[in-house]
């Protein structure tokens, strides 16, 4: 049963999206266009279309570190998500399960931690517009689903 579901309305001029499902948050590094996640499970858009990401293992670089390693996920793009976001209408919504806070797990040798952020912050940083509604549904079984638009300053990386 899902309560307090957020629907992100996509507003992306390149019609490209990065969809990330995670259990725990890790630092985001947009210089190398990588998302750090602990476990990616489901990516669901309206119509129950599922997409998977390629995952590669990453080990902590700190010498003598007991970090078991984490998963490294390259920034993914779906071009296009639909033939046209204009004509897709409600189908361009992505369903996410809202949580009030996101646990962060970061190795001690890393300088920055990803603090819990609100979806308002995400919408501002990643150029998304959204609205919130309350909904109840037993049709989905998923963890945190986040839809991220490609930031303007990384667009050049996707032209190569």
UniProtKB/Swiss-Prot annotation:
Locations listed in the record: Membrane
Main subcellular localisation: membrane
Topology of the protein relative to the lipid bilayer: Single-pass membrane protein
Domain of life: Eukaryota
Record key words, sorted: Membrane, Transmembrane, Transmembrane helix
Membrane-spanning segments: 24-44
Keyword Membrane belongs to the record: yes
Any Gene Ontology CC annotation: membrane
Membership in a protein family: Belongs to the TMEM191 family.
Descriptive protein name: Transmembrane protein 191A
Species for this entry: Homo sapiens
């Amino acid at each position: 049963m899902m309560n307090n579901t957020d629907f992100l309305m996509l507003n992306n001029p390149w019609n490209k999206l990065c969809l990330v499902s995670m259990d725990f948050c890790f630092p985001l590094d947009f210089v190398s266009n990588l998302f750090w996640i602990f476990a990616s499970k489901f990516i669901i858009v309206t119509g129950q279309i599922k997409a998977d990401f390629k995952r590669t293992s990453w080990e902590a670089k700190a010498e003598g570190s007991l970090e078991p390693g984490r998963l490294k996920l390259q920034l993914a793009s779906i071009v296009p998500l639909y033939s046209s976001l204009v004509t897709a209408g409600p189908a361009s919504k992505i369903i996410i399960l809202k949580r009030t806070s996101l646990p962060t797990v970061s190795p001690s040798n890393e300088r920055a931690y990803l603090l819990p952020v609100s979806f308002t912050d995400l919408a501002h940083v990643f150029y998304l517009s959204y609205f919130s509604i309350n909904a109840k549904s037993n049709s989905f079984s998923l963890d945190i689903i986040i839809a991220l638009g490609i930031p303007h300053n990384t667009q050049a990386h996707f032209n190569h």
